[in-house]
Amino acid sequence: MDLGGDKGEKGMGKGIVEKILREHLVEGEYKVGEEIGIKIDQTLTQDATGTMAYLQFEAMGIDRVRTDLSVSYVDHNTIQVGFENADDHKYLQSVAAKYGILYSRAGNGICHQVHLERFGKPGTTLLGSDSHTPTGGGIGQIAIGAGGLDVALAMGGDPFYLTCPRVIKVNLTGSLNPWVSAKDVVLKILEIFTVKGNVGSVLEYGGPGVKTLSVPERATITNMGAETGVTTSIFPSDEETRRFLKAQGRENDWKRIEADPDAEYDRVVDVDLSKIEPLVAVPHSPGNVKTVRSVAGIDVDQVCIGSCTNSSYRDLMIIAKILKGKRVHPNVSAVMAPGSRQVLMMLAENGALNDIIAAGVRVAENACGFCIGNSQSPPSKGVSVRTSNRNFEGRSGTKDAQVYLVSPETAAATMITGKLTDPRDLGIPYPEVKMPERFIIDDSMILPPAEDPSRVQIYRGPNIGEPPKNDPLPPDIDGVVTIKVGDKITTDHIIPAGARMKYRSNVPKYSEFLFEIVDPKFYERAMKIKNSGKVNIIVGGVSYGQGSSREHAAICPMFVGVKAVITKSFERIHSANLVNFGIVPLTFVNEGDYDRIDQGDEIEIRNLREALKNGNKISVRNRTKGLEFEVKHDLSRRQVDIILAGGSLAYVKVKKG
């Protein structure tokens, strides 16, 4: 269906988001702020979140995925130190073969880059167990990151539930100047919207500036838009989209999707592309945006190019052209990780890879690698300049490292000079990169499912355990504040990636590293409280649960007996994950009450089950301090029922008898 001119009710025009969501609506009413359920056409998983997602899918007892397309990618845990990663990959490959899922082998590339190249379809819905799934918005797809359990449910044919979003139009005008690229655009978006206060919103790009951006550039913008906390971001599907799909041999997947001229939005933000200059996110948040020139001159130890944000053919060709005939500064360790095998093969064929290697850049495999902190950790107190999307403290694998997020152009300039450098100051002409009319297409590392699933044996190594089970929510909570944390606590703070990520399939072991970065004694304290018969309660500040979609930031707290998290505000994916695992997400009615609670305080919530069912305000008593305060929730009726049952798996079993 061509969605270029589909009118809404009473002749009102519709935007892209509304058109696609209405077409996929299966539950609820399309009304901003209300819960809706949408049909999911495609799913993707990556190996760090995928093992648990497929274990949960198996527990549902369904014999075949019920989506149009589901793909299992291996791109996170590709450094085999010990048996765990290899065992997980064998499990994932066998599950994919048995249940009708495509399997993208290690080395084929980063899930978002490969999916954009080979599977993304305008006008469809994509749910991925990775927070940067909105990359698909660059091709005109409603692409949303979620926890693995939500993805498992979607694979089983259930709707995906979300709050019907406020839609913010980002009206792009003008065109980018030389040495300014899509990464600078999304850093400008982060400067405008910040990393908090955007839950329940979607960014819809439009305006005359859109046609000046290629699909990979658009995908860079929608990818890192995840850092604002929006549900997703999306671009129109136009002739530029058609050219990209034709070059991928997929022109038949194209359809035009544009907003109606009279579409209405909750807000319109104008961005003049011609006024953007090279930008950088300084430590320790993607929202700490400054101009490169304002912080230029910092000595740099490391430059890393790649990640799902900036590892496309266009990005790496820019790097190659800037580096051609030059050398990486002797004080800089430089590494490049292509986003896909297709990109690497293109660079090898046209000679660009030789230019990169000749300059002194190390070439890593086509994977996430340094971005998630499981390789290329910087030196102690080192400065690392990266083209990735997150610079949270400790995420690089080095707790005291300073990580700066930049465009490929700025990264290449910095490699050469050894200092953080505005690329305009290199004094050379801006390289021109022409997108190929035809990409190299070789899908031999994407394995189809078995023709006869009954003959497939699921491989389960010792690292693969059963999904942990939770009890129904008790009538009352008698607990202890196990930890009190501040604002902008990320899922990296809650449960680290990096070297610990190989334990993702082993929840009891992985739980030992809860809050390791913040408080190494948390696990010991939590287990002591649990074993005493009390429950654990976490208290946090603003935007609790930023960052990665990893549901282990909810599964592991559930395992150690956390029953409630009380904060000033939550980020969307983490709040949904808490619900999925039977943990109650509560917020302070009066934020000042945060200051009246301390770690170790004994907390009680009487008649919690009844309170959840009957209203959104709940009374909490701090027995240690002898005071009471109110908290609230914004859960739907369905979410309340999930929590009462002890989580989504238990709820589904009750619902389906």
What are the residue ranges of the model-derived segments?
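Fe-S-dependent hydro-lyases/dehydratases of central metabolism
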Residues: 3-4, 8-657
